[in-house]
């Protein structure tokens, strides 16, 4: 007689759980992890993204639920591609000119890496636009990674992706700088050498304009090339398929902006969960926040074509979802998050940090003053030509960055502070001139002098708005912050990257040091 009441209680208990099915909201990473690619190994997921001229290169992210990610390592401890990655000069740019013609490698470095797992090892491939195609391997995605291997030594290549067929044959697909044709090569079984000059497998300037970023897969006997078309700002995602890996490929658009505000939802990677769900991670260009990462469901139709996002009635493509049920990964949703704040209490920098170009290792330290980051100023006339600017990827949409600076060891002509780094950067900091330390606000190379610093420490803050402007302020007592100047618009395009919060020190005179106690990030609510 108690069966019915017990069943009713069980149903009541289950109802809220069903009604409260976990969901996620796009973007999953409001951060500039451009050209993302991802894989699943076991019940874990790994992602890589473009890092361009920042060092260490190629961040490796990890997730258990496909939505929450953290950084676990980098493929490249330094950028080994040539001396210009050490910013030797002579420099032809300044804080108002964005396109260098020598002395640096802005916009060079790592373009559009791919990650795969084969024969018990992780493989990452990438191109540098002036040097060619490279790869590295590791047994643990957190590292250590092997030294970079030059797979194809030729300029003008981009966006490589390896593929091992069922019989072990290794292939490599890539594009050309300028969104040229997609080219397929045979590779040695270990993936370290291209065995031929390659064949063009896709090129159609009218139907497939700006074809780039290919990812090569196989499913149900079909070979698939996932590739964006139409350009970064507005292009859709296309897929080509063929029975023979060499083609010919038939092409179809699988993800369009549709009626959503998400323009240019493309370039990324496909992954399946253990339950067979398909998911596609891609970027969306946002200006100063860079190319942020969205996650779309991917559904395979009965005709073996994929549709990405929410299917559009009567069409062969989908459109981006704003929110969706969490992926069925078999894992509970996590609370993992991208690292940001740093108290500089460790013997090593946090994984969230990367230098503008390769650092001068003898000119920075976490050991000389334990608990502080010390930057020894190197000669430079402009922030964009200064060595050892320490950056991290900005996480939107309303971040605030605060640091404490000790100026006691600064020298005449030295500058140090907090910047939103990019093309035509702005910064707030301290300049020592005439034996005095003054708070200064700079924008596009123009310095506005503020009050003299009363003590030897000052807290500096940068608050970024969702509309992509920054407001700087400072505090001499650690509690009351005084705004300095009007909001400054951030550059919407900075050498293929978004604007980045960064700590810096350089000198137009003598060489001193700047000490930073901590760097704290607050993600502000609307």
Regions found by a protein language model. Give the residues of each.
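Carbohydrate-active catalytic/glycan-binding domains of CAZyme proteins
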Residues: 19-526
């Amino acid at each position: 007689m108690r069966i019915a009441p017990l069943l009713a209680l069980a149903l009541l208990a289950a109802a809220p759980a069903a009604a409260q099915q976990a969901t996620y909201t796009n973007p999953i990473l409001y951060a500039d992890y451009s050209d993302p690619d991802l894989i699943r190994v076991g019940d874990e997921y790994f992602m890589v993204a473009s890092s361009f001229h920042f060092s260490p290169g190629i961040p490796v992210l990890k997730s258990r639920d496909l939505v929450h990610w953290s950084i676990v390592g980098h493929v490249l401890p330094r950028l080994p591609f040539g001396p210009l990655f050490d910013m030797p000069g002579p420099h032809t740019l300044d804080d108002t000119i964005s396109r260098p013609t020598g002395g640096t490698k802005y916009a060079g470095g790592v373009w559009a890496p791919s990650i795969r797992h084969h024969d018990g090892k992780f493989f990452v491939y990438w191109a540098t636009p002036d040097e060619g195609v490279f790869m590295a391997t590791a047994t643990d995605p957190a590292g250590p990674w092997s030294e970079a291997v030059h797979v194809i030594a030729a300029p003008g290549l981009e966006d490589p992706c390896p593929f091992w067929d069922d019989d072990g044959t290794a292939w490599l697909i890539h594009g050309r700088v300028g969104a040229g044709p997609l080219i397929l090569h045979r590779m040695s079984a270990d993936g370290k050498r291209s065995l031929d000059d390659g064949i063009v497998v896709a090129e159609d300037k009218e139907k497939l304009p700006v074809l780039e970023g290919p990812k090569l897969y196989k499913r149900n006997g079909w070979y698939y090339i996932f590739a964006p078309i139409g350009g970064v700002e507005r292009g859709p995602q296309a897929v080509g398929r063929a029975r023979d890996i060499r083609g010919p490929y038939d092409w179809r658009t699988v993800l369009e902006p549709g009626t959503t505000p998400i323009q240019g939802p493309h370039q990324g990677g496909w992954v399946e969960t253990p339950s067979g769900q398909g998911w596609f991670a891609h970027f969306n260009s946002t200006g100063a926040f860079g190319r942020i990462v969205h996650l779309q469901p991917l559904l395979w139709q009965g005709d073996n074509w994929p549709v990405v996002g929410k299917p559009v009635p009567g069409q062969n493509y989908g459109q981006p979802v704003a929110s969706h049920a969490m992926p069925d990964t078999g894992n509970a949703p996590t609370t993992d998050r991208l690292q940001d704040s740093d108290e500089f209490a460790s013997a090593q920098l946090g994984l969230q940090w990367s230098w503008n170009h390769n650092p001068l290792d003898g000119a920075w330290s976490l050991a000389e003053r334990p608990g502080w980051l010390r930057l020894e100023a190197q000669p430079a006339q402009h922030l964009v030509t200064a060595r050892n600017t320490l950056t991290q990827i900005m996480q939107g949409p309303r971040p605030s960055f605060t640091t404490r600076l000790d100026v006691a060891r600064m020298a005449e002509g030295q500058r140090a502070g907090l910047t939103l780094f990019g093309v035509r950067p702005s910064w707030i900091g301290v300049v020592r001139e005439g034996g005095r330390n003054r708070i200064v606000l700079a924008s596009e190379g123009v310095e506005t002098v503020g009050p003299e610093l009363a003590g030897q420490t000052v807290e500096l803050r940068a608050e970024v708005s969702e509309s992509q402007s920054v407001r700087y302020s400072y505090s001499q007592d650690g509690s009351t912050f005084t705004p300095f100047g009007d909001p400054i618009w951030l550059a919407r395009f900075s050498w293929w990257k978004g604007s980045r919060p960064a700590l810096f020190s350089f000198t137009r005179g003598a060489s001193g040091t700047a000490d930073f106690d901590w760097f704290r990030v607050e993600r502000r609510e609307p």
